[in-house]
Swiss-Prot record:
Segments annotated as LRR repeats: 71-95, 96-119, 121-145, 168-194, 195-218, 219-242, 244-265, 267-289, 290-312, 313-337, 339-361, 362-385, 386-409, 411-433, 434-457, 458-481, 482-505, 507-529, 530-553, 555-578
PROSITE patterns in the cross-refs: PROTEIN_KINASE_DOM, PROTEIN_KINASE_ST
Name of the protein in question: Receptor-like protein kinase 7
Species: Arabidopsis thaliana (Mouse-ear cress)
Extracellular-side segments: 29-608
This enzyme's EC code(s): 2.7.11.1
Amino acid sequence: MAPSLRNFNFFHRFSTFLVFSLFSVVSSDDLQVLLKLKSSFADSNLAVFDSWKLNSGIGPCSFIGVTCNSRGNVTEIDLSRRGLSGNFPFDSVCEIQSLEKLSLGFNSLSGIIPSDLKNCTSLKYLDLGNNLFSGAFPEFSSLNQLQFLYLNNSAFSGVFPWKSLRNATSLVVLSLGDNPFDATADFPVEVVSLKKLSWLYLSNCSIAGKIPPAIGDLTELRNLEISDSGLTGEIPSEISKLTNLWQLELYNNSLTGKLPTGFGNLKNLTYLDASTNLLQGDLSELRSLTNLVSLQMFENEFSGEIPLEFGEFKDLVNLSLYTNKLTGSLPQGLGSLADFDFIDASENLLTGPIPPDMCKNGKMKALLLLQNNLTGSIPESYANCLTLQRFRVSENNLNGTVPAGLWGLPKLEIIDIEMNNFEGPITADIKNGKMLGALYLGFNKLSDELPEEIGDTESLTKVELNNNRFTGKIPSSIGKLKGLSSLKMQSNGFSGEIPDSIGSCSMLSDVNMAQNSISGEIPHTLGSLPTLNALNLSDNKLSGRIPESLSSLRLSLLDLSNNRLSGRIPLSLSSYNGSFNGNPGLCSTTIKSFNRCINPSRSHGDTRVFVLCIVFGLLILLASLVFFLYLKKTEKKEGRSLKHESWSIKSFRKMSFTEDDIIDSIKEENLIGRGGCGDVYRVVLGDGKEVAVKHIRCSSTQKNFSSAMPILTEREGRSKEFETEVQTLSSIRHLNVVKLYCSITSDDSSLLVYEYLPNGSLWDMLHSCKKSNLGWETRYDIALGAAKGLEYLHHGYERPVIHRDVKSSNILLDEFLKPRIADFGLAKILQASNGGPESTHVVAGTYGYIAPAEYGYASKVTEKCDVYSFGVVLMELVTGKKPIEAEFGESKDIVNWVSNNLKSKESVMEIVDKKIGEMYREDAVKMLRIAIICTARLPGLRPTMRSVVQMIEDAEPCRLMGIVISKESDVKVKEIS
């Protein structure tokens, strides 16, 4: 072989060896870093790391979530949506010098981001969004190759390092929204110097000041979101240069002035939302935005007419203009060319008829035109709108009859036509309205009898028929409405008797049948309604005695005046002064304005009756004893059959008991409460430990069972409440959420076993006979703990868990008065955002804890429903009042009452619970401010629970221990900043 050829072969082999060695070194370094990363999450047992093994043969490039370049260097780590929690080892990961992409979004990572992040100098893509980090985001000037930066919704706080953006001139996406950063005095100038930006998301991150004219220099922008901020001043005319924009979000700021001239140049705009500002002028600049799909301009001060061109937009499906000063008619062509989905033009000065074609293409879900001056009748076309879910046209000047088919639309959830001039009947078509949750028909001229078919609308929760011309009997089928909470029938011409079946409406809280011609006796079944809060049967022709069963109710309002009642006023009801006037046949031993009841023992004839009653009573007692012995025998047989039944137990935590220990203790004497979806029992185990057992009731087959029947009775399958509660609680691990130990099921019964909380509920502590004198520090700790529990539900998962029935009776207290969120029978896990979260046909919850306008403007149940309910709980803690009190007035709740007492500092102090010490009253007012923010009328204005927790932490009272240290600490922080 020639020397030159030998030299070439040697050089070739040496080069190959050298390259292979270098490859091995780089891959080995990267491998060690990745294995260290894996070890950081060793306790999590996550499937994503199963492939991250030392002996995988190919090296780190084969790991799931890892990408390498052609030289074998790790360039990308994508662990988004992988269930990661805890601290992430940024210090070691940033040793990978070739790393260009780090994607960790949609996890539960926590802790403070270390300054080591600046060592990831090759990063082009960084996604830390939707996590649970804390503290400030570190300075990142060295990351000068960044093109994509996602930090949104990750709980960062403090001062954001805006100056670091000066080196990030290649940024295409900047997403910092939904973080409680320290407020800026002005709009950050560093942002408007990023000329390559196509996506800018700065919503809800404490940006303040005016929108700078230089925003017009970002001509590549396609998405601009700066909503939920402190922006002021006018929208600069330079914004018209952003001709590539397809989405512009400016809502919930304090912007003023008119839409700038040239705004119509943004012809690519598809989504525009400038709602909840102080904008004025007309909407004429929008007439040329023909590509609009969604236009949201509600809650401003716009005036003038709605452009006729809106009726010609072919893609417009969502139009929200409510709470402005718009005049003229709605464009009659609205929806005729588009797949119209939603319109809300409520609370304006609109006139003319309702456009007939908004459901022409059969896609419309909501028609909301309440509080205007509309005239004419409801177009017949809407009786065929099978997709319609909400129909609200109250407080207008509409007339005519309601199209028959409208009553029975299959997806309709709410009909609100009150305060108009409608005539005619409710037709039998209503039987087809299986999703119908609310009927608001008050103050019209509707007439005829209520159809018996109204009982077939299984989902009805609110029926308001007041101030109409209805006649005839109240249909007995009303007892089939198991979810009915409010029944208002006052000021009509109803006659006949109140049906006994009303006692089957176990969720009723408000009944008003005043000013009718109802006769007969008051049904004793009304006394079996556990949640009844207000009962008004005044101005009728009722006769007979007042049922003793009413004594068991805890009513804030009772009015039986102006009837034909007779007999004794039950002693326990005598405190309802004025509730019995106009009934000359009534007598009382305690109310002076009534005749004194005659003592039966004074009459010889009555004495005979008295003796007969005793004899008769003894006979009943004897018969009861025989029946009791028979039941005992039956229960033993039942117990023996349960023993041999096939049970399945599914545990979620370490347990020291068996299913037999639980089943043997489900007895009447262990019953401690009835929840929204089941009965609760206290069970003492053999080792002395106590647990709570909930026996879930089937919603679909729920019946009224007597206490004499077997407790674990046959069921038709598993209830949806049981499945919901198990699904929700089995995976939850949080200090402030009640612990679920296991579920126990058979073909016939469903049981859930929880930790037992000995101090009952917050409601008990504040309002019941068990109420305790809670100090402010304890109330504060309860508020903070409950808020953290809800925050975990809303933000601790990839998809939020919505409780849907937050109230003080569902906040349980342990032996140290630490709170736990409980009763998840109504909970809902929001579905993936593809197509939006599922809507629900009825806003679940409890009267007094639900926003009055939730039906009006909330198209779906969201986390903001829980936020409102929690705000009501905070008001209970501060004021000591129940959500509904007689002193608030007719149709008023605690939110109205608090709002009406905000006129001065003195009036605010007056509503703070007198049991709260003087030194803490200012702290209580701080909490009241948070409650007011939480109970904002519009869901969009309510904070997230994450923000609520932060606000409550900021409102921590100065405690007597360590007060000097705390003050010094505060001073030091201020000096450092």
